[in-house]
Amino acid sequence: MDLYSRKIIAWTLSKTLEVDEVLKCLETAKSRRKTANPVVIQSDRGIHYTSRRYRELTRDMVCSYSRKGNPWDNACIESYHALIKREWLNRFKIMNYHQAYQLVFEYLEGFYNTVRIHSHCEYLSPNEYENKYMLEETN
């Protein structure tokens, strides 16, 4: 999640909690956000985010870790997880991985980034807020 616009930059849905999935997601995010500015990446202290492979992949970033037992340090992504459950996933009886993937895709790509407004983003969607920023930067 980009904390400026609240846009989900990259995501994955995995049947297992393997570090490879985290790394693939991070690679996708890096390819979508080519920037000369310093990148700060916030995560919890899970084994995926403290692994040697993760640290190698993020060596050109500033890694910020939440304090142990303090989910408030990751409040934005925790809030997103609550939203997707409350606004979308809890409406369905999910039968399999494919259905779960489709539902997450529909919410994220078809609603959250494109339609859902955020007070932080001046009541614009993440995409609209980013576009507004880009227009202001070019003027």
Short names for language-model regions:
Residues M1-L3:
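Gly/Pro-enriched, hydrophobic low-complexity segments
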Residues M61, L83-N139:
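C-terminal domain-tail junction helix/linker
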Residues R55-V62:
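Two-metal-ion acidic nuclease core segments, chiefly of the RNase H-like superfamily
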